[in-house]
Amino acid sequence: PPGKDGKVNPNILAAAYVAGVKEIYKVGGAQGIAMLAYGTESVEPVFKIVGPGNAFVAMAKRLVFGTVGIDMIAGPSEVCCVADGADPTWIAADLLSQAEHDPRAAVFLITPDADFGKKVEAEMERQMKELSRYEIMKSSVDDYAKAFLCKDAAQCFDIVNKIAPEHLEVELPDPKQYLPLIYNAGAIFLGKYTSEPLGDYMAGPNHTLPTSGTAAFSSPLGVYDFVKHSSVEMYNKEAFQKISKKVQIFAKAEGLTAHAHAMEVRDED
């Protein structure tokens, strides 16, 4: 989509060139989704639309699903941090890195240490005042920030799996040991040096991620979203004869006599 000056960000154009993109359309919003889904006199309709957008884009993607494929319905950004014994300054900074996205961005802190939680809260208040998007962060933190005090790691990750966050930071000693406890999260960041903005820009995995709890049943965008496959079956006569009667039993149990008949006529061969 173009900026307020009507131009496409040159950094996006450069990235598209490096990626080998052949066509670029300077359009955004719900109207851009409609254009791609249904086509125009100058634009051919596409098979699939992917990527995040505002609430209007999200609703437009929902409406055109079925005419085209989509990746997901993305909502406001969210980050969840499970931490104990970490630097509260670092944790606060990571939480604010998502709060600055949107007044409705959600930030969660899960910890077994109440004093640590208070230090993180104080750090967030201090750091917000020094950053340029203060009003956005303030709205996010006031309305959508939650802290959970847990008795142990198992309870921490039980809460994580209920939230199913878009981004999950695990800043505990030996963080890899907790991976088997994590079932629902879009992207998982392990260790104190794996700050969430690394995933936004440089880490490698695609950062279009399921939000609003949909990580419980959805995965990040990946190359598999741009491919599809077909199943292929082939029986010879011997294989058919071994299984024909069983197929007929299933078909008749469902009352689908034409299915059974398609098997029976071959039994006579």
Task: List each language-model region with its residue ranges.
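Short acidic loop-to-helix transition motifs that present clustered carboxylates
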Residues: K4-V8, V27-M35, P175
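C-terminal core of ALDH-fold dehydrogenases
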Residues: N161-D269
